[in-house]
């Protein structure tokens, strides 16, 4: 029998962190992060990284892993996450995978082997330059749509990073991302993943998101971005993240402070909507009510696990 691994996904601001920490305390678990921004060092406020205090002594893996100047592929994530899961199981503890990055979650749940594709940096630069011109991103979006319509259904027309990624993969391999995923799903899945998703009524979730953004600003998000720019003048991938790119636009006088804050809220709400759509496609997923008592959701998780 394959070892069981708990996976908790959900949109941003749905309460994944607090639920997972309470669960870990109850069942002697450790947490494997499934978040493409919390892997970066020095990007704490904007990525809603749990603080030492919030972690309550529970060990977290794949957090503060790389510098914002480094690229971190899905292939690398899968490898590191499986190593962490194995390490947790060896200790006789329960692994709990937690986060909102659908691509990371899928790589584990479906055993998708994303080969570490050697990308053409020059071509990426070319695409970045086009994306930064008026209507350039729109043109790239249309081009990517012709290459891989299925993958583009899940990608927003403003998501520069992922649009460019679709084009890069095709240029490097001659195959689109969807074809590659189909081929790579033939692998045996290592563990018995029990997947739970947190659901919250849209208006309440959006209210939480707006509030969270205000708190991030109060906590010093603008200062965090200033420090990042000073410390890492070249960190294009990390800077495409929601909450960071808008503050950069504000610091470059492209937006007022109020406009930047409003844009972060709007982009985060859109992202949450895409996350929910993504998680709905996961087979055998068990939905939890995010407004329920934490202990009640823990009870539901444990019933499925036993």
Regions found by a protein language model. Name each.
Residues 1-306:
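Phosphate/pyrophosphate-binding catalytic cores of soluble transferases and nucleic-acid-acting enzymes
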């Amino acid at each position: 029998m394959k070892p069981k691994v708990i996976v908790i996904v959900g949109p941003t601001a749905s309460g994944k962190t607090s639920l997972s920490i309470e669960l870990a305390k109850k069942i002697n678990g450790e947490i494997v992060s499934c978040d493409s921004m919390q892997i970066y060092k020095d990007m704490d406020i904007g990525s809603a990284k749990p603080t030492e205090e919030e972690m309550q002594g529970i060990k977290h893996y794949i957090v503060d892993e790389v510098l914002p100047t480094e690229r971190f592929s899905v292939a690398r994530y899968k490898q590191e996450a499986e190593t962490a899961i194995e390490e947790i199981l060896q200790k006789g503890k329960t692994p709990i995978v937690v986060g909102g990055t659908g691509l990371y979650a899928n790589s584990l749940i479906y055993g998708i082997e994303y080969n570490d594709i050697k990308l053409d940096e020059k071509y990426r630069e070319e695409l970045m330059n086009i994306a930064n011109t008026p209507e350039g991103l729109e043109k790239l979006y249309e081009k990517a749509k012709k290459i891989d319509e299925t993958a583009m259904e899940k990608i927003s027309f403003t998501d520069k990073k992922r649009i460019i990624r679709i084009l890069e993969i095709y240029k490097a391999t001659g195959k689109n991302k969807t074809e590659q995923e189909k081929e790579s799903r033939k692998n045996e899945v290592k563990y018995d993943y029990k997947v739970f998703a947190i659901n919250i009524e849209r208006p309440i979730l959006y209210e939480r998101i707006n509030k969270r953004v205000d708190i991030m600003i109060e906590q010093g998000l603008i200062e965090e971005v200033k420090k990042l720019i000073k410390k890492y003048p070249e960190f294009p991938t990390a800077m495409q993240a929601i909450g960071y790119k808008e503050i950069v636009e504000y610091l470059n006088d492209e937006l007022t402070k109020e406009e930047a804050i409003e844009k972060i809220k709007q982009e985060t709400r859109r992202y949450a909507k895409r996350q929910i759509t993504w998680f709905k496609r996961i087979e055998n997923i068990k939905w939890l009510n995010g407004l329920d008592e934490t202990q009640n959701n823990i009870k539901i998780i444990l019933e499925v696990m036993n």
